[in-house]
Amino acid sequence: MRLTICCIGAALALTLACAGAQKKGDVARGKVVFEACSPCHNVDNDSRKMGPSLKGLFKRAKLENGKKVTEENVRSQINSDGRQMPHYQDILSDQEKGDLIAYLKTL
């Protein structure tokens, strides 16, 4: 009986620990999310629209704000206060942001 209770407790603990983990971004879904970004950002070439081209973004040393190109800094830019680009913090879900970043990493 004790063994059963311990096993159930361990299974519950593992389930709760895994439930909080975010899913990895999905490239195909990220491409769809990017459609909202495409009026201002280019991914086909290096030409600038209203915002910078995002082609090869994760191959660059720095973002336009001077910060190093990392997933965290790109997510922070997506969540920006709206001075440099529209404020997407409350528009896109965390999963959509992860999907978008996964897509941008393929460019």
Model regions and ranges:
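Ubiquitous "structural anchor" signal
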Residues: 14-17, 38, 59
